[in-house]
Amino acid sequence: MWTMGYNEGGADSFNGGRKLRPLIPRLTSCPTAAVNTNSDHRFNMAVVTMTAEQNKRELMMLNSEPQHPPVMVSSRWNPTPDQLRVLEELYRQGTRTPSADHIQQITAQLRRYGKIEGKNVFYWFQNHKARERQKRRRQMETGHEETVLSTASLVSNHGFDKKDPPGYKVEQVKNWICSVGCDTQPEKPSRDYHLEEPANIRVEHNARCGGDERRSFLGINTTWQMMQLPPSFYSSSHHHHQRNLILNSPTVSSNMSNSNNAVSASKDTVTVSPVFLRTREATNTETCHRNGDDNKDQEQHEDCSNGELDHQEQTLELFPLRKEGFCSDGEKDKNISGIHCFYEFLPLKN
């Protein structure tokens, strides 16, 4: 900044007698000031140089020395082998929960072997008791499981021996073949562990075969005997057994079919006419009365034996019954069974 000043001499009219001068006064240059400036500069340079050298030395020291991680100081107790040996010996002697004074004594004794505090001794006894309880419980559970497994194995082996004994491992084939009049279909093989079942089946099977055989034989015998009897016995026999024949109609039908089958199987054809029966009525009256009782018993036995077999099919009566040639005049209204009727069919004449 410059200011205008007044020139008293007035020599310069162009400037109007005025001139510019600075607001801040100029510093006068002196040799002492230059010396001071040079000395400060030298001091600063020396400080910078020393600092740089110190930094270099520190870097060199860091590079030359190995780097170690910082050591972390832990507050956890690390027992020494001697301390553990003393504590385990005290535990074996019976010390489980020591008192405060006893803990202080143990701590003072163990400080000779390393760093330790009273709380470390207390927690060591507590943890040792807990570990011993867990170990005992684990042993008990393992022993119980072994006992259960052994018991289960014994039970399973015993049950297997009872289920499949060596004496009963016999595979029996029930292949019984019956005689005349029985089914010849063999039974399926089956494994039997009981000896009573095949005997019962065999008895039932033989009973059925015997019943069929007896029925066929009785049917043939009865048919032949009834063919030789007079007509008067037919009506009396029918009157005596009318109720049984009505009540047991399926049995009568089955007997009819059995007797007819037996007669056809024997291939004997017998033809009896009504005239022949009338002529024999007078001569065989006493024989009829004498044989009547035997025939009644035989027919009753036949009805009883045939009544037990209900599996036979019923047969239909294909032809009506004839009563004129077989009954007397007083007994024409009575029904006559179809087992005593025989027909002879002759060829028709053209």
From Swiss-Prot:
Domain of life: Eukaryota
Gene Ontology terms: biological process: plant organ development
UniProt-listed CDD domains: homeodomain (cd00086)
Spans annotated as Disordered: 283-308
Keywords carried by this UniProt record: Developmental protein, DNA-binding, Homeobox, Nucleus, Transcription, Transcription regulation
Stored PANTHER family: WUSCHEL-RELATED HOMEOBOX 1, WUSCHEL-RELATED HOMEOBOX 1-RELATED
Protein's name according to its UniProt entry: WUSCHEL-related homeobox 1
The species this protein was found in: Arabidopsis thaliana (Mouse-ear cress)
